Amino acid sequence: MLRTHLAGSLRAEQAQQTVTLTGWVARRRDHGGVIFIDLRDASGVSQVVFREGAAAEQAHRLRAEYCVKVTGVVEVRPEGNQNFEIPTGAIEVNVTELEVLNESAPLPFQLDDQAGEEARLKYRYLDLRREGPGHAIRLRSKVNAAARAVLAHHEFVEVETPTLTRSTPEGARDFLVPARLQPGSFYALPQSPQLFKQLLMVGGIERYYQIARCYRDEDFRADRQPEFTQLDIEMSFVNQDDVILLAEEVLTSLWKLVGHEIKTPIARMTYAEAMRRYGSDKPDLRFGVELVECAEFFTDTTFRVFQQEYVGAVVMPGGASQPRKQLDAWQEWAKQRGAKGLAYVLVGEDGTLGGPVAKNLTDAERDGLAAHVGAKPGDCIFFAAGATKSSRALLGAARGEIARKQNLIDPDAWAFVWIVDAPLFEPTADATASGDVALGYSAWTAVHHAFTSPKPESIDTFDTDPGSALAYAYDIVCNGNEIGGGSIRIHRKDIQERVFKVMGISHEEAEEKFGFLLDAFAFGAPPHGGIAFGWDRITALLAGVDSIREVIAFPKSGGGVDPLTSAPAPITAQQRKESGVDAKPEPKGDAAAAKPQVSAEK
């Protein structure tokens, strides 16, 4: 090794020891001919001092981010010169030898300044030298190790599944890779290891896991990455409770890394209850504001806006004092989410109701409204009316905005909940409206994916009554973020074919795209289930950062572009020719037979 110690490891107990350190010049200060350098490596920072001799002469040429090697004696800093904000603040190294390992060009941004994200991503290798980004990547490694330790204890087998496979519809668009040796044919990068892990269960592996890279060619949304990581787990001969028990053990081990003990078992909530109370299937339970059903309260209303299948409300504590400008801003906020607006009533300090909606209510409605929704003097009541799903979603989003504006969220709190009993299917129109790629060609598509088993009570009726069928699925939510989702899978060929039929996937298409899975189910496939954790999101939560880009070594920008390498980029004409990307596949079946034949005779 070029060094004897790590810069961040030195303490007063090592005084008078001769040490060799390596790292980067973080800061340089000249004081009356004495040069002080903050020397940084992966472990932290130590102050090194150049007082005299050849090393001090050399030190005058040092600049920010020069890579250096120094040898010197550890000394206790004089009284009053200690820096108790860093672990090494009680000592300094009196340098006797200096070697410049490499110089640095002028920096595109100062590492101790707040740089723009575009610059940070373009020079990510510099960004990673900063304490925050470097810590996040090292934390991610510890997260991986902690999960592996739990799974190894339970004798899980880590298996790498293919990253070049065939295109199979899974709910998003595939990234396609041309197959040079078969012009006109393409591999697909996997959206998840879903089908292969199920085949591993058929193969008797029984307990599988993988820290898996996944790829989805989605329309770009905030804080999404085209390539991301899952901790993927699958188990044979299990039910929902078995998977949840293991998942909680994994989560407990991860949160211990940041000093938090998760209380288990984690509470469970049905999808229906979550939507009714919070307007979201991933509710943030760190604060107590809930939606209130009001349709029955307004049964006999003469106010046409509230003559709808659903009327709901959410209370903003202290919101009656908002200026008119802020109330108008709420209307624009709602319109950006596809609503016509956000009706409101202001509760005065004397209990009287104000605002445009209050004028349209009867005396009885005005008298009873505050008590019905739990509003107090000084509160604001927001309403949504119309289709149940969209109205609840609007109020759920408003609930989150209220919490942020009114500082209702404890930033140090962790609130976990399992969401169970979600619908098995949803109307295809709803899926496409929310930006998802609907699988199949019927009026119904899968909420999770096509391989999720119906709950036992829905097995006999899910194809005759798709709208009422429940999925044997479970999602884990932390602080309003879905950090994992799983299900008990279909393991019988007849049930899988019935699910495909509900989704409008023909027998022929099912055989073409999923025939290998259906064939496997015919050979004694065991009952099985699993879960996939969103590894980037979990690590971001543990690191205390807002964006998953902070915990990915080399992330893409919000537009899916890599500023560091300028990917994606055009290919050359030669690459295009060699890859066969423009080749047309040979026709099959009847089309091939109908193709005119060219005689070989001259």
UniProtKB/Swiss-Prot annotation:
Which top EC class applies here?
A: ligase
Give the matching Pfam families: GAD, tRNA-synt_2, tRNA_anti-codon
This entry's Gene Ontology molecular function terms read: aspartate-tRNA ligase activity; aspartate-tRNA(Asn) ligase activity; ATP binding; nucleic acid binding
Q: What chemistry does it catalyse, as a reaction equation?
A: tRNA(Asx) + L-aspartate + ATP = L-aspartyl-tRNA(Asx) + AMP + diphosphate
Q: Which PROSITE patterns match?
A: AA_TRNA_LIGASE_II (PS50862)
Stretches the record annotates as Disordered = 559-602
Q: Where on this chain does ATP bind?
A: R216, D217, E218, Q225, E482, G534, W535, D536, R537
Q: What is its main location?
A: cytoplasm
Q: List the disulfide bonds.
A: none
Taken from the UniProt entry, a GO cellular component term is: cytoplasm
Instruction: List its EC numbers.
Output: 6.1.1.23
> Where does the record place Basic and acidic residues bias?
575-589
**Which HAMAP family does this chain map to?**
Asp_tRNA_synth_type1
Subunit architecture: Homodimer.
Annotated NCBIfam families: aspS_bact, PRK00476.1
Biological function:
Aspartyl-tRNA synthetase with relaxed tRNA specificity since it is able to aspartylate not only its cognate tRNA(Asp) but also tRNA(Asn). Reaction proceeds in two steps: L-aspartate is first activated by ATP to form Asp-AMP and then transferred to the acceptor end of tRNA(Asp/Asn).
Protein name (Swiss-Prot/TrEMBL): Aspartate--tRNA(Asp/Asn) ligase
Please name the taxonomic classification of the source: Bacteria, Bacillati, Actinomycetota, Actinomycetes, Mycobacteriales
